[in-house]
Curated annotation (Swiss-Prot):
PANTHER family linked: MITOCHONDRIAL RIBOSOME RECYCLING FACTOR PSEUDO 1 (PTHR20982:SF3), RIBOSOME RECYCLING FACTOR (PTHR20982)
Signal peptide location: none
Protein's gene: frr
Acetylation keyword on record: no
Pfam families in UniProt: RRF (PF01765)
Alphabetized UniProt keyword annotations: Cytoplasm, Protein biosynthesis
CDD domains for the chain: RRF (cd00520)
Family: Belongs to the RRF family.
Known role: Responsible for the release of ribosomes from messenger RNA at the termination of protein biosynthesis. May increase the efficiency of translation by recycling ribosomes from one round of translation to another.
Entry protein name: Ribosome-recycling factor
Record-level Gene Ontology MF annotations: ribosomal large subunit binding
Amino acid sequence: MINEIKKDAQERMDKSVEALKNNLSKVRTGRAHPSLLSGISVEYYGAATPLNQVANVVAEDARTLAITVFDKELTQKVEKAIMMSDLGLNPMSAGTIIRVPLPPLTEERRKDLVKIVRGEAEGGRVAVRNIRRDANNDLKALLKDKEISEDEDRKAQEEIQKLTDVAVKKIDEVLAAKEKELMEV
């Protein structure tokens, strides 16, 4: 029973860290990266379709993304979807290839992005702490029902705290790496 609670907490904490990494990958840095456009959907046969299903996105160089659209008729829709996104990008098309130059980030915009990233990381920490709380509540319920002893409860809570510390440390490492990436000129 205790092992199930610990395993569940571990899995949920790992998912929280992965979700944070995924969210942070969408934050624009000064460098071109295909995942930058991963959140963009294009209207395709009446359905919103992720960009990576209707086109191939590659980093042409450090400041340019190249998008090869599979269906010529979608080129304008892809361009429009990129312009309508809140990324502040201006695509230029040449046939079926769309080039998206990334303007350099201003110092002020970098600082704003760092604040956003820190907020995301704090959200990740809160999620991990909530998972710890849920696990500890499950342990208290077992203790109350006399399914485990107080010693087992205390030991399990200490182990869950260790899992929490590891997850928070991972979040801090991800945050530090993203901040460093954002502040590079």
